[in-house]
A protein has these predicted regions:
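Basic nucleic-acid-binding interfaces
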Residues: 1-86
Length: 86
């Protein structure tokens, strides 16, 4: 499961050939959450409120990139890094 971005201690990961709907995983400390890409929203898991708001902000900024990486992952192609939240 490649890490496609990391910021403020939050790791953003995407699995190869993962189930629909298009989504990514985020880890922070001992917490993990799964975020749908379009529309952006929590599929499952729990995150501290501040960390969740940062992940949502990042996902909104890079939604197109996330969909491109989801397509690459679904086709077992090498994933590209997405810039962190600044």
């Amino acid at each position: 499961m490649p890490t496609i971005s990391e910021f403020f201690g939050i790791m953003i990961l995407m699995f190869f050939d993962d189930h629909a709907p298009p989504h990514f995983h985020a880890r922070y400390g001992g917490d993990e959450i799964v975020i749908q890409i379009n529309p952006i929203g929590v599929l499952r898991g729990k995150f501290p409120p501040r960390a969740l708001s940062l992940v949502i902000e990042w996902a909104q900024k890079y939604q197109q990139n996330l969909m491109e990486e989801w397509t690459r992952a679904a086709n077992n192609k090498k994933l590209h890094k997405i810039p962190p939240l600044d």
